[in-house]
C-alpha cells in the first residue's frame, strides 16, 4: 500500500548530514508506508488505547464517534489522556473539565475598543489543550509519521524547536501519543512555559536569546542531529503539515464564524495574522479561495521588521518574528505587512487585565462581558489585534467588513510578565489606564506596507539565505513555491484526503 504524493523530489546538494536532514523535512508530506514499523505502532496504540482523529473530525467534531464524546465528559481539557487528541479542534466547549463540542470559540472586539468601522473578530486558542492552538500543528506533523511507520516511538524522541507554544503543543501531543519528546526554546521566554514543559517533556533545552533568536534554535537542531541518533526533529518553520492543518482546519473555522455573525451585506475585509512559523497563514490561503476579495496581511514586530525592511532585532511579542522568512510562508497569497511596536502589546495587556484598565474600557463603552474575556488574548493576540486595527484603518474598511485575526493563547501563560511590568513600572492606576486607552484610540496607519508583486517576490527570495545557503534545501523547490505555486501549494492542500485515509486504516487496525 503506497500513498506517495510528493510533487517535487529534491536533488542532492553535497552538504552532508545537515543537508540530508533539512532536505528530508522539506519534502511534500511523505505518505509512503513502512509496513513493519507501522504494525509496531498499531500494536503500541492498541496497548495504550490510542486512537487518532482525522482532519475531517478536527474540522467537524460531529463526525467523532459518540463513544469518544462520552469518554471526554470525564476528562479535563489539559489532562494527559489520549482521548484529548479529539480536542484538537476549534469547536471545544469552553470548559476546563468534561466539555463537549459546540460552535467555534471566538471573540468579537467591540468598536468601543477598536475604534474602527469594520468588525474585528479573533479565533480564540485558549480552549485547546495547553491553552493554545499549536497542538494542531504538532499533531499534524507527528501523526503522519506514526501512521506511515516512519517514526519509531520506542527508539526515537520527537524534537520540537520553537519560540514558545509549538514546543508546548509538541510535548503534549507526544505524551498523548506515547512518544518521548525534547522541547527547545529560547531562555528568555516566559517562566510559565518552562515550568509547564518540565512536567511534560523528557528533555527541555534552553537556547540563548529571546523571541527572535530562532537561528540559535536551528543551530541546536543541527547539533542534535549530528551528535545523536535518537532524535527526529519536527521544525515548525519548514513542516508543510503545519501549513496544511491551518488551511484545512483553521480556515474553515473562520468561514464558519463568518457565516454565523455576518449579515446579508457582510464581506470578509481581510485576515491579519502574525508570522512566527507562518503556519496560521495557511488559513488565509483558504479564506482567500473562498472569498476572493479578501486581503491577507502579516503582522511583525517593528523591532524586527523582516518583511518591512529586511530587518532584524530582538522584541517582546512572544510567539512571532524570528529574523527570517519561514519556508512554509506562501508569499503569493500575502498582500501586506503591518509593523507593531512591541511596547504597545506590553501596555495593552495591562489595560486589558488590570482592574484599573478594565474599568477604563467599560467607562469608554465596552461591554463588560467582552472586557471579562480580554484575558483570552495573550501578548501575540494583542499584537494581532493592533495589526488588525491598523489594517482596517489603512484600507478604510466599513461597517459591512469583517476582519479576522488570531488570539493564539491567553494571559494564562503571561502572568509573570504582568508581575514583571508592575515591578518595573509600578502599580497600574487609572492615570496610566487613561494614557493607554488614548494610545489604543490613536493607533495610526504607520508601518503598513501594501505589497506589489515585486515586493512579494523579494520577500519570498529572502528564504534563500536561511533555507538554501544555511540549511541546504534545494533551490528547485524554492523556485517551485513561487513559479509553480498553484501546483505546489494546491498539491499540498490536496493531501488531506489521502492522509485521512491512512488515519482511518490505522485506527481500524488498532480497534481489531
Task: Kindly label every feature range from the protein language model.
Residues 13-27:
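Short, Lys/Arg-enriched N-terminal segments with co-localized hydrophobic residues
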Residues 26-512:
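PLP-dependent amino-acid enzyme catalytic core
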Amino acid at each position: 500500500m503506497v500513498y506517495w504524493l510528493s510533487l517535487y523530489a529534491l536533488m542532492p546538494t553535497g552538504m552532508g548530514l545537515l543537508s540530508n536532514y533539512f532536505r528530508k523535512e522539506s519534502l511534500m508530506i511523505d505518505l509512503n508506508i513502512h509496513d513493519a514499523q507501522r504494525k509496531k505502532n498499531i500494536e503500541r496504540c492498541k496497548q495504550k488505547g490510542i486512537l487518532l482523529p482525522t482532519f475531517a473530525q478536527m474540522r467537524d467534531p460531529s463526525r467523532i464517534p459518540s463513544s469518544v464524546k462520552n469518554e471526554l465528559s470525564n476528562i479535563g481539557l489539559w489532562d494527559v489522556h489520549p482521548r484529548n487528541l479529539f480536542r484538537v479542534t476549534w469547536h471545544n466547549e469552553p470548559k476546563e473539565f468534561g466539555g463537549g463540542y459546540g460552535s467555534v470559540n471566538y471573540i468579537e472586539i467591540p468598536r468601543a475598543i477598536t475604534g474602527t468601522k469594520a468588525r474585528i473578530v479573533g479565533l480564540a486558542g485558549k480552549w485547546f489543550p495547553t491553552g493554545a492552538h499549536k497542538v494542531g500543528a504538532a499533531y499534524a506533523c507527528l501523526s503522519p509519521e506514526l501512521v506511515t511507520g516512519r517514526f519509531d516511538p520506542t527508539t526515537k524522541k520527537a524534537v520540537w524547536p520553537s519560540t514558545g507554544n509549538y514546543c508546548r503543543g509538541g510535548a503534549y501531543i507526544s505524551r498523548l501519543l506515547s512518544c518521548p519528546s525534547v522541547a527547545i526554546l529560547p531562555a528568555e521566554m516566559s517562566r510559565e512555559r518552562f515550568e509547564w514543559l518540565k512536567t511534560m517533556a523528557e528533555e527541555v533545552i534552553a537556547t540563548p536569546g529571546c523571541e527572535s533568536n530562532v537561528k540559535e534554535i536551528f543551530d541546536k537542531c543541527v547539533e542534535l542531529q549530528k551528535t545523536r541518533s535518537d532524535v527526529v526533529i519536527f521544525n515548525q518553520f519548514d513542516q508543510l503539515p503545519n501549513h496544511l492543518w491551518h488551511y484545512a482546519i483553521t480556515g474553515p473555522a473562520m468561514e464558519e464564524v463568518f457565516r454565523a455573525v455576518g449579515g446579508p451585506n457582510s464581506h470578509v475585509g481581510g485576515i491579519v495574522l502574525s508570522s512566527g512559523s507562518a503556519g496560521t497563514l495557511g488559513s488565509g490561503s483558504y479564506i482567500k479561495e473562498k472569498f476572493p476579495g479578501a486581503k491577507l496581511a502579516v503582522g511583525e514586530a517593528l523591532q524586527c521588521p523582516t518583511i518591512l525592511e529586511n530587518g532584524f532585532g530582538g522584541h517582546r511579542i512572544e510567539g512571532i518574528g524570528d529574523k527570517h522568512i519561514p519556508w512554509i510562508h506562501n508569499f503569493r497569497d500575502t498582500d501586506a505587512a503591518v509593523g507593531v511596536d512591541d511596547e504597545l502589546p506590553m501596555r495593552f495587556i495591562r489595560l486589558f487585565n488590570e482592574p484599573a484598565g478594565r474599568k477604563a474600557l467599560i467607562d469608554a463603552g465596552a461591554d463588560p462581558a467582552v472586557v471579562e474575556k480580554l484575558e483570552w488574548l495573550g501578548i501575540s493576540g494583542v499584537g494581532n489585534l493592533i495589526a488588525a486595527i491598523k489594517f482596517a484603518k489603512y484600507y478604510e474598511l466599513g461597517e459591512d467588513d469583517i476582519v479576522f485575526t488570531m488570539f493564539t493563547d491567553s494571559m494564562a501563560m503571561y502572568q509573570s510578565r504582568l508581575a514583571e511590568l508592575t515591578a518595573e513600572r509600578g502599580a497600574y492606576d487609572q492615570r496610566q489606564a487613561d494614557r493607554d486607552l488614548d494610545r489604543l484610540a490613536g493607533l495610526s496607519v504607520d508601518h503598513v506596507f501594501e505589497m506589489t508583486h515585486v515586493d512579494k517576490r523579494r520577500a519570498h527570495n529572502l528564504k534563500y539565505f536561511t533555507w538554501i545557503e544555511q540549511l541546504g534545501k534545494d533551490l528547485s523547490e524554492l523556485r517551485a513555491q513561487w513559479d509553480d505555486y498553484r501546483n505546489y501549494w494546491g498539491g499540498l492542500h490536496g493531501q488531506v484526503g489521502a492522509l485521512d485515509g491512512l488515519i482511518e486504516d490505522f485506527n481500524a487496525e488498532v480497534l481489531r
